[in-house]
């Protein structure tokens, strides 16, 4: 699947703790597209990215996603709703 990501999303994934080698390779091969990048992901890679981002989403006492982790929440939603996932 091809997943368009913003520069902020790309940078957040790159900076995530415990970034697996399989995703490092995906980021290294990402194609620039105007304001961001296109990630070319297999199903396994998309699942790994979804799991990594899910682990980095945090909520406040009201159950709302915290502003500093919203970028990960947006990626989870983009992957989960992608027609090729």
Task: Describe each model-derived feature in a short phrase.
Residues 1-85:
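Positively charged, low-complexity terminal tracts
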């Amino acid at each position: 699947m091809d997943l368009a990501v913003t520069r902020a999303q790309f940078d957040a994934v790159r900076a995530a703790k415990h970034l697996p080698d399989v995703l490092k390779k995906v980021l290294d091969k990402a194609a620039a597209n105007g304001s961001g990048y296109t990630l070319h992901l297999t199903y396994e890679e998309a699942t790994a990215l979804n799991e990594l981002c899910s682990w980095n989403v945090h909520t406040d006492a009201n159950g709302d996603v915290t502003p500093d982790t919203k970028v990960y929440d947006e990626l989870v939603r983009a992957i989960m709703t992608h027609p090729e996932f």
